[in-house]
Regions:
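N-terminal helix-rich module
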Residues: 13, 17-47, 55-175
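Glycine-centered recognition micro-motifs in short, flexible terminal segments and loops
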Residues: 1-12
Length: 175
C-alpha cells in the first residue's frame, strides 16, 4: 500500500513538471504550423503572379470568403485572388485591391486559396491593405519599396510570436 502511494506521488510530481513544457510545445507547434501555412499561401500568390503575368492579392477574407475585407486583424482567415480592375467598370485593367474574375484560359478559380479562420487562441495582425504581388514577383505598389509584415501570436499573449515578412522584392521570410 505504501509503495502504491509513493508511485502515485512520484507520478503526480512528474506530471506537474511535464505539463508546462507540454503546453509550451503545443503553443510553439500551433504558431509554427499556422505561420508555415501563411508562408505557403504567400508563395503560391507570388508564383501565380509570375505564372499568369498578372497581379495577385493576399488579403483578409470577408465573411462570404470571396473577396477582401478591410482591417489589420487577419484572424478571420485570408485569401489569394486575381486582381486586374480598379473600379466597378470592367475591362479597365488597373488594380483596385479587390478580387476580379479570372480571364478565360487556365484555371478560372478565384479565390485561388482560401485560408481558414484561426482558432481563438491565435492572433494574426497584418497590413490593412492587401499584399499585392506584381507580374515580376515583386510585392506592393511599384516604386514604393516597403515590406509587408504579419505577426502571429498567442491569445492571451505569452510573448511567443512568429513574424512573416514580404520584402518589396517579393522575398518571403519567416522568423
Amino acid at each position: 500500500m505504501i509503495e502504491l502511494l509513493v508511485v502515485i506521488a512520484i507520478a503526480a510530481i512528474l506530471m506537474l513538471v511535464a505539463a508546462p513544457s507540454f503546453r509550451t510545445f503545443m503553443n510553439n507547434t500551433r504558431l509554427s504550423s499556422t505561420s508555415s501555412k501563411l508562408l505557403t499561401d504567400l508563395n503560391i500568390a507570388r508564383s501565380e503572379a509570375i505564372k499568369r503575368n498578372s497581379r495577385m492579392l493576399v488579403c483578409v477574407r470577408n465573411t462570404a470568403g470571396n473577396d477582401c475585407a478591410a482591417g489589420t486583424n487577419w484572424a478571420p482567415g485570408w485569401l489569394v485572388c486575381y486582381d486586374n480592375e480598379t473600379s466597378s467598370t470592367p475591362g479597365n485593367g488597373i488594380p483596385d485591391g479587390k478580387c476580379d474574375a479570372v480571364p478565360s484560359g487556365g484555371s478560372n478559380v478565384n479565390p485561388i486559396v482560401l485560408g481558414s479562420a484561426l482558432s481563438n487562441t491565435l492572433t494574426l495582425l497584418g497590413p490593412s491593405a492587401a499584399i499585392r504581388f506584381n507580374p515580376n514577383g515583386s510585392q506592393g505598389v511599384p516604386g514604393a519599396g516597403t515590406a509587408a509584415t504579419l505577426v502571429l501570436s498567442l491569445n492571451p499573449s505569452t510573448g511567443i510570436t512568429r513574424t512573416v515578412t514580404v520584402a518589396a522584392t517579393g522575398r518571403i521570410s519567416k522568423q
